[in-house]
Amino acid sequence: MRINPTTSGPGVSTLEEKNLGRIAQIIGPVLDVAFPPGKMPNIYNALIVKGRDTVDQQINVTCEVQQLLGNNRVRAVAMSATDGLTRGMEVIDTGAPLSVPVGGATLGRIFNVLGEPIDNLGPADTRTTSPIHRSAPAFIQLDTKLSIFETGIKVVDLLAPYRRGGKIGLFGGAGVGKTVLIMELINNIAKAHGGVSVFGGVGERTREGNDLYMEMKESGVINEENIAESKVALVYGQMNEPPGARMRVGLTALTMAEYFRDVNEQDVLLFIDNIFRFVQAGSEVSALLGRMPSAVGYQPTLSTEMGSLQERITSTKEGSITSIQAVYVPADDLTDPAPATTFAHLDATTVLSRGLAAKGIYPAVDPLDSTSTMLQPRIVGEEHYETAQRVKQTSQRYKELQDIIAILGLDELSEEDRLTVARARKIERFLSQPFFVAEVFTGSPGKYVGLAETIRGFQLILSGELDGLPEQAFYLVGNIDEATAKAMNLDVESKLKK
């Protein structure tokens, strides 16, 4: 972190001290720049191209040095479109990595990868900036306390509980509800959370970024009257951005979160949607940088790039960063190198299933594929652990019996298996829940269910006390009392029809 004496931003202060080079080659978002002998910039230094294009429009493109090629040339990746750049244009070496504004000045604002505000609310205070590249905290600084982070979402709190100060991944293919789930977590956690939140939109839809901003203004998380009282900073590098911006926007968001953790000593929530796009952007520029592709066409540096980002997302003795990351799973294949590399860094994985989404069960969280390091009796307690294990056993047995049911029918099962299937179907439906952020689509009000209520509900289903209720009574309700009330309503309706 550095304190800038003026508010001129993290750009160039005195050009006389800077190296000047010239563009030698442009291939899409990648530039080769020639510098005078002995004046080569360092890796990760920010370069600025200033000039005028062929129609006399002002150009101001920031690039980041990725490779030193020899013969006094460097290869850099542009953070914005390279349209209008020509060979021979002057390039300024800033002598430092990209730096972005940090601290209270970022709250309530939307920034791009360079730390420039993009919300039309005027310039941001850039007296305090921090470079986006830094090393992860040392082992001695890390905090190892274990505590549960309640989300109010039944399936998550029961089967794959989140760790306070941990890393959580939401895995799913296209259209199974990752973004809706991350929005619900922002709604349930960020609103009740005393600290600050940072949201990094990495290569996702611009419309969703806009919706989130409007929602946060409505809910008061962003305070329009007094912007400094806001609780969230937003950093966007969406689908329309070049790969350089998408590759670095996650680091910009993380740098802002680290300042709140290390300097302000706060507990921070970091939401990233979508971490796969960070890998994808790295893959797009990797071939242009002349690297040989690795498995499935990904960059050979995949693990290193992922590690350099993920290792910085951690909790120290000063404060914590609880990170919730959406992870797109290409073609629903969890063994794809991108999601597989991400798995290794997480404390809890919430896997979304297309099969459950097709049945209309939302959130479509797979109770058997989702895991958490927190689901241990010494952390969550015996009662929670036993209930979760019995729910998983019942769901697993139902899964095993599905082939038999499909071929021979339900009547061919033993009495015990039929009871297991009936309870498993109730559990499957009770794991669904109406969301606050989906109220506008579904028309049913959202529900927040406390952990104690969740455990009580599943214990009642497993004990057989609710065997007499129809399974549709458990679909899209909050706690178990709502399910019994819904069953009574269904009973009254069926009698009226007769």
Swiss-Prot record:
Q: Which UniProt keywords apply?
A: ATP synthesis, ATP-binding, CF(1), Chloroplast, Hydrogen ion transport, Ion transport, Membrane, Nucleotide-binding, Plastid, Thylakoid, Translocase, Transport
Q: Name one GO biological process term.
A: proton motive force-driven mitochondrial ATP synthesis
GO cellular component, alphabetical, reads: chloroplast thylakoid membrane; mitochondrion; proton-transporting ATP synthase complex
**Catalytic activity, reaction form:** ATP + H2O + 4 H(+)(in) = ADP + phosphate + 5 H(+)(out)
Q: Where does ATP bind?
A: 172-179
Locations listed in the record = Plastid, Chloroplast thylakoid membrane
Looking at the Swiss-Prot or TrEMBL record, what is one Pfam family this protein matches?
Answer: ATP-synt_ab
Question: Where does it primarily localize?
Answer: plastid
Instruction: Report disulfide bridges, numbered on this chain.
Output: none
| Enzyme class, spelled out | translocase
Its membrane topology: Peripheral membrane protein
Q: What is its EC number?
A: 7.1.2.2
Q: Which domain of life is it from?
A: Eukaryota
* Single annotated GO MF: ATP hydrolysis activity
Question: Which NCBIfam families does the protein's record reference?
Answer: atpD (TIGR01039)
Instruction: Name the protein family.
Output: Belongs to the ATPase alpha/beta chains family.
Subunit-structure text: F-type ATPases have 2 components, CF(1) - the catalytic core - and CF(0) - the membrane proton channel. CF(1) has five subunits: alpha(3), beta(3), gamma(1), delta(1), epsilon(1). CF(0) has four main subunits: a(1), b(1), b'(1) and c(9-12).
Q: What does this protein do?
A: Produces ATP from ADP in the presence of a proton gradient across the membrane. The catalytic sites are hosted primarily by the beta subunits.
Return the protein name: ATP synthase subunit beta, chloroplastic
- Lineage of the source organism? Eukaryota, Viridiplantae, Streptophyta, Embryophyta, Tracheophyta
